[in-house]
Amino acid sequence: METLLHSEILKKYKEETNEYIKKKNVEKLFDIILKNVLINKPDNIYLYIYNNIYSFLLNKIFIMGPPVLKITSMLSSHISEFFNYYHISLPILIQQYKLNKGESSNNKIIVNDEIISFILKENIHNLDSKKKKGYIVEGYPNNNLQAYSCLKYLPSHVFVLYADEEYIYKKYEEENDIAIFSYTQKKDYDINEPHEINNIDVKPLKDQVLSYIRNISDMLTILGTNKKVLNLHDFNDQMLIDHVKNEVSKNKDEWDSTLNGDI
């Protein structure tokens, strides 16, 4: 009789414990804590966890897309406003850094990956993780080194907005109400080849676009299963916003039961 009673008590205890573990997301919580500790290797592990536990649970969203186009900024703004998340615009932060360093037309400031990493880390560190449930990083990552660094933040989502050269140039012209290229059919490759038609220096534009095209394949490999590739040919602006909203909504409340007091 005692053995049977003990068995029933033990069974009930296991059921309640498993239910608690599932409801409070305990396994994922400890997995995230462990990963953050191993990535950052703090001297005082207890203080590190105590001071940063809320930041571990933020919905961390990175959005990178074609240079010179407005789509990445527009999407980041809409998502941050809709979910009331922090919005970190890396292009703006880099521009502010250059201005603070006294950049001018005769004095160009080079911002390397180390500086970009520092700027981003500092801004994320300064967020009040108790006030909002997540943040959006606009315009990151942009190359292989940045992709590796991005993974260290244990991102919830990395949205990669993909477009080919022709799309980027045509969209740029549309957004800026300007015609700087003509598109003629190239028979050998059956693609449209842009040719300059105005006396405008488009070299900086072309350099940025070519850098994006050159880096994106390797970045996608590095990001692995963490990224979601969205081909801009398949979306208009509103469709893109709605799609990303739906993706972010899937896990926006996943830590509510962990942080709430009810059992």
From Swiss-Prot:
What GO biological process term is on the record, naming one? nucleoside triphosphate biosynthetic process
Q: Which domain of life is it from?
A: Eukaryota
> Where is this protein found?
Cytoplasm
Which keywords, in A-to-Z order, does the entry hold?
A: Cytoplasm
Q: One cellular component GO annotation, for this chain's record?
A: cytoplasm
InterPro entries, alphabetized = P-loop_NTPase (IPR027417)
Single GO MF annotation: nucleoside triphosphate adenylate kinase activity
Record keywords: Magnesium included?
no
Q: Which family does it belong to?
A: Belongs to the adenylate kinase family.
State the protein's purpose: Lacks adenylate kinase activity.
Record-given protein name = Inactive adenylate kinase
Specify the species: Plasmodium falciparum (isolate 3D7)
**Gene that specifies this protein:** AKLP2
